Amino acid sequence: MQFSESWLRTFANPEKISTDALSHSLTMAGLEVEEVGPVAPPFDKIVVAHVLSTERHPNADRLNVCQVDAGTGETLQIVCGAPNVKPGIKVPCALVGAVLPPAEAEGKPFEIKVGKLRGVESYGMLCSARELKLSEDHGGLLVLPEDAPVGQNIREYLDLDDQVFIIKLTPNKADCLSIHGVAREVSALTGATLTLPDMKPVAVTIDDKLPVKVSAPDLCGRFSGRVIRGVNARAATPAWMVQRLERSGQRSISAMVDISNYVMLELGRPSHVFDLDKIHGGLDVRWGRKGEQIKLLNGNTIEVDEQVGVIADDKEIESLAGIMGGDSTAVTLDTTNIYLEAAFWWPSAIQGRARRYNFSTDAAHRFERGVDYATTVEHIERITALILEICGGQAGPVDDHIVNLPQRRPVSLRLARAERVLGIELSSAVVADVFQRLQLPFTRSQGADGEVFEVTPPSYRFDIEIEEDLIEEVARIYGFERIAARPPVAESEMRPTNEGRRSTHVVRHALAARDYQEVINFAFVEEKWERDFAANDNPIRLLNPIASQLAVMRSSLIGGLLDKVRYNLNRKAARVRLFEVGRVFHRDADVKDGGLTVAGYHQPMMAAGIAYGPAFEEQWGITTRNVDFFDVKGDVETLFYPRVARFEPVEHPALHPGRAARMLIDGKPVGVVGEMHPRWLQEYELTQAPVLFELELDALREAGLPTYAEISKFPAAVRDLAVVVKQSVRVQDMLDSMRAALDKQGCGRFCQSLVLFDEFRPKAASAAIGADEKSLAFRVTLQDTGSTLQDETVDSAVRCMVDALGEAFQARLRG
């Protein structure tokens, strides 16, 4: 929001407050002033001058010798090359000794001296707006109004000591997107009187009305308009209006457009002016229809659909509702009859529509945040008065259609609650004074916690919905600087920590220690990733995605990790190991609204990792090989230590059907680990298969308490057991069977380890092993802490394992 200080002070003028103090007050009230600067650079000795006569330079075709009255008591001869110089005009004149601003940013100031131009003496310089750094217009001299007083300092005449404010507004402060809105804040902060422009109804001199129908009350809540005939569109915009527009960052276009823009900046009301003679029949405010097109004022031709609001006549669309008018009914210099429109558009109906077509407008910026719905008629009267004053014409009656206005429900503020939130003592009188200064209507009552204020938000305040909004208003006007800085006071309470539960930070460090690097991805992903890696055909969609590719919430971390692997591979990284800790999102009807939950959605934290390329950094002591399933399985087992994970085959849409496993801790599934499915290697252009895992973070954090075991001083008995079984038999099932047999035999406490150390699959059948069989070799280590194990005990333990394998899997000892 950009505006001049002088314009603001016509609405609210705190006389004893300087520019710097005013800027500071606005910033501390939440209206951050990004920049304050003069409208013109410093210069002096430039005055209003009257060109008395001109004649051609005797030695140059493009120069004129001018006789100028600059109020010095004598006529000055000045040589000028401007194309628009002529007798009778008034222009800025730099006298001898004046110093003009540098022509370029890094240049030096330019001093005016008595000089000769092609042999003719010149005693000054007639100036353009560009030479004074007032604008970029270089079409000729800056022509001043005829009533400009000759000899007056141009800084004083044009108010060039005025300051331009640039305010950075937060999205909730749509009520301050106008001079009126900022002035309301200044009045509340300083006590200055708020003065508004005259918005009295103009005299109605014709009875003409344009038929209007509002077919979409969920798009437009109020539509006001009026016919004005006989306007002069070629009328010049007054200098004072042009000046205020330019100092607000707006370029003067034509009187009709300038008036509309002026009132938008003044009162915050975007409006639109139609050429009445180009409208076919009446207007219909409705949602668009698929396939309809409109050429906009910016020259773009766009196609609308049922999600975009439009204003249409009996033949075609004439305006994109609340965003931009159409080219077909645009006013021109030949326009004589107009239809003036001001409406209340529902913010939800405007939000995101302009961005959809890759442009933005001041109107859309305001309407999508909320514009006052109670003052459309008053603002039309203001615009009409300016049009009649500048362009002339005859005004018809205002046609006001009220169809669906917001219902303002009172918002309660508990005085005790405000004191707790702000940490200060507040009297009832202070809060009441704040609301009165902000023009917020309220009533008082007594509640269980003390006094309660019931505030009804005004029609221009769309940011007041809950109690905290009112507390913020109290804090802003009371003054953040008046709130003393005090350290928080809390009871010191010793709470036991759960030694068996690790923090997320520890889990991250453990992953980093396994040579994985952390990445942080967006929680919204491509819909294709959800289908490919999670078999999710109904993902949670975003209502307003930041990009079309990032349109759904992720239910798995795998897609984001794979994308980052490809990103690194494209930058010539040969070995990539990444992990991420973050939330995923699932539909779950059992989840209710809570402090950290949203009804219908389960949001668990997950930890996932991916490894691609060589298992180790290249070095002379290790043979280079690619990472495999067992490398990553070992990493995962390390993360869960000292808890022991059990693995079982799993089918997962992202993983290889024969090289993937589900992890179980205490019989509960906690995640998956495996090699990427071959079909994704080709589709995502990978030359080898990455290995990845995805685990529940809560399970990783449950480390369990460490248990201490006595170290035996007696020798261990080690036995190797080679058995032949069918190739379909799973090793994990055999290990479980042997451990169960040892426990049943009473030898389970002696078993220090039981591992598979060899596997043999014959290429052809033999007498020892059939074609559909395999040989597995297990090593069991038995050791007691109280005594040396006798051979009978060891043999009995081995025998019970062999018997168990034979009974469960028809295993036989290998000969």
Curated annotation (Swiss-Prot):
Lineage of this protein's species?
Answer: Bacteria, Pseudomonadati, Pseudomonadota, Betaproteobacteria, Burkholderiales
Where Mg(2+) is bound, by residue?
D463, D469, E472, E473
Q: Which family does it belong to?
A: Belongs to the phenylalanyl-tRNA synthetase beta subunit family. Type 1 subfamily.
FDX-ACB domain segment(s): 712-814
For this UniProt record, the keywords arranged alphabetically read as follows: Aminoacyl-tRNA synthetase, ATP-binding, Cytoplasm, Ligase, Magnesium, Metal-binding, Nucleotide-binding, Protein biosynthesis, RNA-binding, tRNA-binding
Where in the numbering of this chain does the B5 domain appear? 406-485
User: Which major enzyme category is it?
Assistant: ligase
GO terms of molecular function: ATP binding; magnesium ion binding; phenylalanine-tRNA ligase activity; tRNA binding
Where does the protein principally reside? cytoplasm
Alphabetized InterPro entries for the sequence = aa-tRNA-synth_II/BPL/LPL (IPR045864), B3/B4_tRNA-bd (IPR005146), DNA-bd_dom_put_sf (IPR009061), Fdx_antiC-bd (IPR005121), Fdx_antiC-bd_sf (IPR036690), NA-bd_OB-fold (IPR012340), Phe-tRNA-ligase_IIc_bsu (IPR045060), Phe-tRNA-ligase_IIc_bsu_bact (IPR004532)
Q: How does it assemble?
A: Tetramer of two alpha and two beta subunits.
Protein name as annotated? Phenylalanine--tRNA ligase beta subunit
Q: Provide the species name.
A: Cupriavidus pinatubonensis (strain JMP 134 / LMG 1197)
Cofactor: record remark: Binds 2 magnesium ions per tetramer.
SUPFAM superfamilies named in the record: Anticodon-binding domain of PheRS, Class II aaRS and biotin synthetases, Nucleic acid-binding proteins, PheT/TilS domain, Putative DNA-binding domain
Q: Name one GO cellular component term.
A: phenylalanine-tRNA ligase complex
Q: Which GO terms describe its biological process?
A: phenylalanyl-tRNA aminoacylation
> Which reactions are catalysed by this chain?
tRNA(Phe) + L-phenylalanine + ATP = L-phenylalanyl-tRNA(Phe) + AMP + diphosphate + H(+)
